[in-house]
């Protein structure tokens, strides 16, 4: 497709990015440390971690993995923790050891964790003690041989560390009992690792950096193989958007990092972009605690914040949020789900800063398109493809869509994954001659901006997290009182979408509460259906396939538009 969207690029901005500056993420890391050794890299719970300390501790972590665990290049290491200082230390330690990082949602149920560890073949895992009991239940069914255990406050000063760990365990009782007798502690790893020799591996752009798990219409989680080159390219593409706002490298700038780092949007557009820009990332461990989050925001004059619609909306609905100092705020980025017009308008009215909306998918590291910086207000589009990205819009008949016509968005660029881990058939379904089928139906309007009109996939998007209908249905069908079940996403004012399940009973005694409690045993909270409707029968095709779209259309028709 001719790159007519270049007309929307800001005047003087680059249309092609030279990303050859780095051969690997390690090179990008080394440059950041070299240029800003004493600048704060991360702040969490008031504790500062400078770039120099990050280098020292991640090197010790890498040396321990190389010498004590004897891990070999290409081995997979899982990370299961919220936003703590331990995360970047472990992440860069894993990458610096030549290993592959596997991000795990710490809220996973034992079943979900087991499936991901089995599929990735991870041989080691770093887990925070709050979720160690989940790991204990499944670790012996996986390839995991080494467990590194950390506590919430482990990277804080002695007094604060002691207090935080005590409160978390004994006052708030957030650490269920567990038994992992062969685990080593995070602090042990660092104290021993600093006396071990670190050998810097030769890493190329083609080497894998991450197995980032996503899903599909089959409901089976798949590991997107993201290389060092994929990530570097996407960091430069994100930098193209952010640098005009916060590009003054000569001084310390700060950004709020509330999205979980195990999510690909936060990983690339926050963690690694801010590393490249030399920006101080203020880690928010529990953004669901809005009162605590706002209290933390009041402590800083921050230049940037990233979030999803749900998060921006929750902040705006908090009375104390208006007391935050927004005088330095230059960049607000929304991703993961559509930003609602009402939220964008209220955000600008309060902060004086527009939300720049981005669009992407895990398989593309994730950034594909964004509203350019010269768009002065939220316009409901996903903007234009970022530099070094080709797109085509294909109609159902296989022909190219014209301006104003709907079709499936296909993407090509160096940010596109190598494929799905050990799933060649699934890879061939979405990757053809370097082109990635997004599954999203889009229109390019007369201003050459892209607008999503539908999702070809049946994925449900809850607060920026993908939920796969077949996974929900499989869990519901485990209940012996259920005859048939089908899950859909329905519009929700706060989370974008929520899950509704339609059920045909096998036993009339089945209740909604009973079914919800059943689901909670197997599914993370955001995957548990919020709405349950019992029906005598479900709409089907002549061959007996349930018509999910019929149910979705019925729901959309009877609900107010948000």
UniProtKB/Swiss-Prot annotation:
Q: What are the protein's GO molecular function terms?
A: ATP binding; long-chain fatty acid-CoA ligase activity
**Pathway named in the protein's UniProt entry:** Lipid metabolism; fatty acid beta-oxidation
Alphabetic keyword roster: ATP-binding, Fatty acid metabolism, Ligase, Lipid metabolism, Magnesium, Membrane, Nucleotide-binding
Q: Which reaction does it catalyse?
A: a long-chain fatty acid + ATP + CoA = a long-chain fatty acyl-CoA + AMP + diphosphate
What cofactor does its activity depend on?
Answer: Mg(2+)
Q: Which biological process terms from the Gene Ontology are attached to this UniProt entry?
A: fatty acid beta-oxidation
Q: Which domain of life is it from?
A: Bacteria
Q: How does it sit in the membrane?
A: Peripheral membrane protein
Q: What class of enzyme is it?
A: ligase
InterPro entries linked: AMP-bd_C, AMP-bd_C_sf, AMP-binding_CS, AMP-dep_synth/lig_dom, ANL_N_sf, ATP-dep_AMP-bd_enzyme
Q: What is its EC number?
A: 6.2.1.3
Query: Which cellular component terms (GO) are annotated to the entry?
Result: membrane
Compartments annotated for it: namely: Membrane
Summarize the protein's role: Catalyzes the esterification, concomitant with transport, of exogenous long-chain fatty acids into metabolically active CoA thioesters for subsequent degradation or incorporation into phospholipids.
User: What's the family?
Assistant: Belongs to the ATP-dependent AMP-binding enzyme family.
Q: What is this protein called?
A: Long-chain-fatty-acid--CoA ligase
What gene is it encoded by? fadD
């Amino acid at each position: 497709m001719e790159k007519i969207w270049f007309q929307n690029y800001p005047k003087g901005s680059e249309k092609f990015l030279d990303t050859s500056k780095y051969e690997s993420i390690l090179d990008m890391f080394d440059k950041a440390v070299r240029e800003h050794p004493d600048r704060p890299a991360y702040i969490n719970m008031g504790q500062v971690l400078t770039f120099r300390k990050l280098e020292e501790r991640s090197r010790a972590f890498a040396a321990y993995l190389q010498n004590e665990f004897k891990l070999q290049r290409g081995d997979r290491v899982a990370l299961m923790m919220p936003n703590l200082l331990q995360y970047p230390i472990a992440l860069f330690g894993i990458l610096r050891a030549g290993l592959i990082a596997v991000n795990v949602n710490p809220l996973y149920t034992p079943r979900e964790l087991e499936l991901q560890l089995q599929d990735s073949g991870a041989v080691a895992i770093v887990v925070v003690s709050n979720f160690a009991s989940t790991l204990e239940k499944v670790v012996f069914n996986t390839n995991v041989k080494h467990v590194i255990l950390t506590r919430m406050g482990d990277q804080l000063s002695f007094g604060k560390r002691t207090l935080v760990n005590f409160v978390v365990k004994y006052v708030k009782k957030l650490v269920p009992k567990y038994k992992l007798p062969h685990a080593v502690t995070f602090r042990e790893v660092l104290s021993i690792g600093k006396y071990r020799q670190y050998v810097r591996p030769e890493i190329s752009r083609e080497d894998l950096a991450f197995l980032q798990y996503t899903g599909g219409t089959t409901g089976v989680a798949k590991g997107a193989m993201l290389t060092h080159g994929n990530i570097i390219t996407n960091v430069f593409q994100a930098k193209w958007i952010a640098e005009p706002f916060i590009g003054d490298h000569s001084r310390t700038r700060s950004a709020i990092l509330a999205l979980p780092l195990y999510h690909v949007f936060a990983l690339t557009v926050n963690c690694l972009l801010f590393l490249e820009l030399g920006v101080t990332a203020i880690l928010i461990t529990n953004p669901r605690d809005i009162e605590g989050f706002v209290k933390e925001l009041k402590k800083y004059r921050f230049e940037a914040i990233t979030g999803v619609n749900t998060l921006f909306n929750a902040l705006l609905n908090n009375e104390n949020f208006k007391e935050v100092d927004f005088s330095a705020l230059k960049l607000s980025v929304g991703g993961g789900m559509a930003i609602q017009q009402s939220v964008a308008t209220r955000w600008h009215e309060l902060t004086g800063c527009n939300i720049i909306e981005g669009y992407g998918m895990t398989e593309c590291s994730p950034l594909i398109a964004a509203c350019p910086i010269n768009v002065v207000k939220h316009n409901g589009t996903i903007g234009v493809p970022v530099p070094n990205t080709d797109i085509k819009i294909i109609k159902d008949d296989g022909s190219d869509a014209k301006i104003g016509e709907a079709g499936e968005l296909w993407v090509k660029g160096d940010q596109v994954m190598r494929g799905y881990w050990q799933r060649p058939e699934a890879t061939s379904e979405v990757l053809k001659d370097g082109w990635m089928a997004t599954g999203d139906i889009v229109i390019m309007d007369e201003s050459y901006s892209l607008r999503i009109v539908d999702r070809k996939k049946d994925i449900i998007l809850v607060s920026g997290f993908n939920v796969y209908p077949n996974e929900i249905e499989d869990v519901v069908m485990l209940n012996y009182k259920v005859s048939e079940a089908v899950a859909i996403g329905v519009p929700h004012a706060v989370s974008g979408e929520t899950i509704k399940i339609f059920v045909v009973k096998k036993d009339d005694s089945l209740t909604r509460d009973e079914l919800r409690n059943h689901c909670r045993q197997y599914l993370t909270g955001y995957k548990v259906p919020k709405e349950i409707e019992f029906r005598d029968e479900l709409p089907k095709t002549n061959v007996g396939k349930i018509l999910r779209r019929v149910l979705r259309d019925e729901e959309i028709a009877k609900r107010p538009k948000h």
